[in-house]
Amino acid sequence: MILVIGLGNPGTEYQYTRHNIGFIAIERIASKYHLSFSIKKKFNCEIAEAVIDRQKIIFIKPTTYMNLSGKSVILVKTYYNIKYEKVFVIHDDIDLEIGRIKFKTGGGNGGHNGLKSIDVVIGNHYNRIRIGIGRPKNNHDVADYVLNNFSESEYKIAMQSIDNIANNFGLILEHKLAEFTNKIV
């Protein structure tokens, strides 16, 4: 069983913000498998479930807002008894240039409040798919930057990266993490 979490904030006002790239990515991956999300109040998330390549996979989008994502993650992880190595979090990364993708297991949260929330409840030994959103220019406020929409050119770059992740997601299901890592760079 695999748990894939896309980080973001609920609500149409956040739908295309930089901070919601995790939601955008998980929706694209789920749509590749013809899945749709439904609200699960008991888990504080939207969820899509399927058996793909003989493996149960659960996609979630926490509805708790970014800074409380851990509340949803711990409920789903505990209910389904999912191992740490089978947890994948897709999130924005301000320290990576727009569209750059990095995969890693474990490590720090880089100041990302969604990851901090998850780390508090399950530790930091899970997998991360980091999608670069770049840094604000001219010392603009970071919170304001991540909560603003992508420019049209940034959105195109971000979507190319998301498509790259979605097109190679099957490698995760095949337990080929090294190959996935090489394909997404």
From Swiss-Prot:
It is found in: Cytoplasm. Gene3D superfamilies: Peptidyl-tRNA hydrolase (3.40.50.1470). Pfam families: Pept_tRNA_hydro. GO terms for biological process: protein quality control for misfolded or incompletely synthesized proteins; rescue of stalled ribosome. Disulfide bonds: none annotated. One of its GO terms (cellular component) is cytoplasm. Belongs to the PTH family. This is Peptidyl-tRNA hydrolase.
